[in-house]
């Protein structure tokens, strides 16, 4: 698929966003070079109690605990093993209260599903959230998505809208996860700067279209609207012989390994990155 066709696909996408920046700008490599702060409209205002509490906390561990407690209170979810509440974990098998037995969608379940298969139903919901909030459509879900009127697009839409995952205000949960990540990253800016140097291992560029070659090893690639990176180059080599190295602005980070003490992405230290066009340096592992 050539660069002109790809650009057309993005231009036909939903250019409206909930972060105050047009999707064409968010999609560009230029945004990554000179990012501006992003906030999802109304989230901090609607959850003022949480962010007032966070403003009183200096310790990162206490901040994470405050966030987890707030999510448990607001959405009836928990951060313990398997995403179950303490009451459910301590109850004998089959003795969980009836009101707790039905499936309760949560951001932790989505992260766990992503860790297992980023092209599964949970991955579709996460990509759908990015599409809704940032106006960036996915370019890959199980296989390349080249046009809207296609079986590939229809399959993605069917999975992202599954009623199983859209109970319990799941996108509002993801809004809060993003805003909490931005709150934490803003407080680390003095030590990390505006960008994180991240790595992604691939075996080919089937999922990442090359838009422009800048130098022998430096290219602009179009990443899927949500992708996994890692801060550890050695970990990236587990997933492919070609290592993409990118400077990712804080504003395009949904989740990172040390954000919460309990989550399903611990093993590989994943960072969930909002996609678009990125300048990357490609080397062999």
Walk through the language-model features, giving the residues of each.
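Intrinsically disordered, low-complexity, charge-biased terminal/linker regions in eukaryotic proteins
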Residues: 1-102
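Acidic-enriched, low-complexity/disordered segments with a strong bias for Aspartate over Glutamate
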Residues: 2, 14, 33, 58-59, ...
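Residue-identity detector for threonine
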Residues: 16-17, 49, 69-73, 139, ...
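ADP-ribose/NAD+-binding catalytic cleft of ART/PARP-like enzymes
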Residues: 20, 77-227
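Compositionally biased, intrinsically disordered low-complexity regions
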Residues: 44, 78, 82, 203, ...
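Helix N-terminus capping/helix-initiation residues
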Residues: 58-62, 120, 249
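ADP-ribosyltransferase catalytic core
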Residues: 216-285
């Amino acid at each position: 698929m050539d660069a002109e066709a790809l650009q057309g696909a993005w231009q036909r996408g939903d250019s409206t966003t909930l972060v105050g920046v047009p999707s064409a700008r968010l999609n560009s490599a230029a945004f990554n070079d000179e990012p501006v702060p992003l906030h999802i409209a109304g989230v901090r205002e609607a959850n003022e109690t949480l962010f007032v509490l966070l403003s009183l906390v200096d310790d990162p561990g206490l901040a994470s605990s405050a966030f987890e407690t707030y999510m448990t209170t607001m959405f009836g979810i928990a951060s313990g093993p398997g995403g179950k509440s303490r009451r459910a974990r301590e109850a004998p098998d089959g003795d969980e209260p009836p009101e707790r037995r039905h499936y309760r969608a949560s951001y932790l379940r989505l992260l766990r599903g992503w860790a297992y298969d980023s092209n599964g139903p949970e991955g579709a919901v996460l990509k759908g959230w990015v599409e809704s909030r940032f106006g960036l459509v996915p370019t890959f879900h199980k296989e390349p998505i080249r046009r809207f009127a296609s079986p590939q697009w229809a399959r993605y839409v069917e999975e992202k809208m599954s009623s199983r995952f859209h109970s319990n205000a799941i996108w509002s949960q993801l809004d809060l996860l993003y805003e909490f990540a931005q709150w934490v990253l803003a407080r680390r800016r003095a030590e990390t700067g505006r960008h994180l140097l991240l790595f992604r291992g691939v075996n080919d560029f089937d999922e990442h279209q090359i838009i422009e070659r800048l130098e022998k090893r430096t290219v602009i690639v179009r990443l899927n609207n949500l992708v996994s990176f890692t801060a550890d180059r050695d970990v990236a080599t587990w997933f492919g012989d070609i290592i993409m190295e990118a400077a990712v602005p804080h504003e395009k980070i949904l989740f990172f390994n040390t954000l919460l003490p309990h989550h399903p992405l611990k093993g590989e230290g994943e960072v969930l990155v909002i996609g678009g066009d990125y300048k990357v340096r490609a080397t062999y592992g």
